[in-house]
A protein has these predicted regions:
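C-terminal motif of bacterial Sec signal peptides marking the signal peptidase cleavage site
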Residues: 13-17
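Bacterial signal peptide processing site
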Residues: 19-21
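N-terminal low-complexity, Pro/Thr/Ser-rich intrinsically disordered segments
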Residues: 31-66
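Short, aromatic-enriched amphipathic alpha-helices that serve as compact interaction elements
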Residues: 56-73, 172-188
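Surface-exposed, charged secondary-structure patches
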Residues: 85-142, 203, 209-259
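Short beta-strand edge/turn micro-motifs at domain boundaries
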Residues: 136, 140-170, 258-279
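Surface-exposed beta-loop interaction hotspot
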Residues: 154-192, 199-210
């Protein structure tokens, strides 16, 4: 199956704020953050496992990873066993096929997150020529990033390695340190805003239109996106090159549930500030 995203959010308050659907990630080294009944999820997995992945799903990495994360049979076929596991660049072990545990990534939480240096990099999501992608699982509590390395071999995406690195060595380290506090501290959110923040939200009177304006920091509780992920985050590196930039685009994308949130942060005088957002 191929997932599709719909650029829309529902409204929850009368002053055109974003929706208030709350979904928090769990901070654990478990293979997934299970936010649904596991029995029902296992039954769904069995059904999906019997559904072959369309060949076209290897064209776009997003289409592949959704299938890979939901289809156990496919996942086992698309891993290069024994799978090497590295820590700080050194090989620590190799996982044999019989020892592998199903990795659902972000599928059961209903959304995933992306980090870009600029909006132009977002186009890489639809690039069918890329052959190397890294899915990052970011654990704030233990200050570690788990990287799943995928390479396209003979036209098929394969998981070729897993790497563990400390957050401080990540190319987004400065932003991640800031975002970890921003995501869980409402007062810090207000204090981490530009004097005016540009926003775009759905028009409550027209399902096909949006409203764009500016808000003051003290208005944030009424206008903020309904979901600001915390706990364990994900990031997909499609080939975007990160730098010590003064701008980060943080995106939240729903999995077949219509959710899409975009927040733009800029670093001014060493301090990250939210400058615009849309949902």
């Amino acid at each position: 199956f191929i997932m599709a995203f719909i650029f829309a959010c529902s409204l929850c308050v009368t002053n055109s704020s974003c929706n208030d659907k709350k979904m928090d990630g769990a901070d654990s080294l478990a293979s997934d953050s299970t936010l649904v009944d596991t029995t029902a999820a296992d039954s769904t997995d069995e059904i999906i496992a019997e559904t072959p992945m369309p060949k076209a799903a290897d064209e776009l990495f997003d289409d592949f990873i959704f299938n890979f994360a939901a289809n156990k049979k496919l996942q086992m076929k698309r891993i290069c066993f024994p799978l090497p596991v590295y820590k700080n660049g050194k090989l620590t072990k190799e996982i044999e096929k019989g020892k592998w545990k199903m990795e659902h990534f972000f599928m059961r939480q209903g959304y995933y997150t992306l980090i870009f240096d600029n909006k132009a990099q977002i186009k890489l999501v639809k690039d069918t020529t890329i052959s190397h992608v890294v899915v990052e699982k970011i654990f704030f509590k233990i200050k570690t990033v788990q990287q799943f390395v995928f390479d396209r071999k003979n036209g098929e995406w394969m998981l070729t390695a897993i790497e563990y690195k400390p957050i401080f060595r990540n190319m987004n380290a400065s932003f991640l340190k800031f975002y970890e506090k921003f995501s869980r501290d409402s007062l810090f959110q207000i204090n981490s805003m530009a004097e005016e923040v540009k926003f775009t939200t759905p028009d409550p009177d027209d399902d096909f239109s949006s409203i764009t304006g500016n808000m003051m920091p003290e208005q944030w509780p009424d206008f903020k996106p309904g979901l600001i992920p915390t706990g364990t985050l994900y990031n997909i590196i499609y080939g975007q090159k990160y730098s010590e930039s003064t701008r980060k685009v943080f995106m939240v994308r729903g999995i077949a549930n219509g959710l899409e949130i975009e927040m733009v942060f800029r670093r001014r005088s060493g301090k990250w500030l939210l400058t615009e957002f849309s949902c």
